[in-house]
Amino acid sequence: DLRLTGLQASSRQRALAIDFGGYLKGVALDRATSILLAQGVGNALVNIGGNVMVLGSRNGQRWRVGIQHPRQPGPMATIELEDGEAVGTSGDYQRYFEVDGRRYSHVLDPRSGRPASGTQALTVLITARPAAGALSDAASKPLFIAGSEWPDLARRLHVQHVLRIDGDGHWQVSKAMQGRLEFVARPPPSLTVVP
């Protein structure tokens, strides 16, 4: 029961809440890095709930961040970030619920109104550009929801760097992202490179 009137949304359901946190973290990244730059800070790593954006370098070296494994403790890979780049991940492993042993993501598929399925985790890297933080956050969700159709959507969104773990634990990586990843152990045997 959500009513939209112009730019205003309302409901009679007292329990209804709309949470924009999933997209506003990326906007907050852009805002935080702008404030840091305005204050003369040229080197920083900003992490807002798993969304990361970097400025400059770490003691002359690129910033290196880990990409969390969706089913095991610790990172599955690391990636070096250059000045102004941002990383965003959507997954079913931090906010979820289980019913009869089946995991349901907190990310809803707007086509069905049900939790998105078929993807355990999806990470995007956005190269330095205006609103890189917002795009890293905003792009990871629809690509997560798109499931196996993510390559077509990534092309339409102009997102070149993508890593996806599907619902069965198979890894898919865009060619551009493959060149940026360093696997913690060895590359997984079920890795598919998507052109």
Name every feature range the model reports, one short phrase each.
Residues 1-195:
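Mature catalytic core of soluble alpha/beta enzymes
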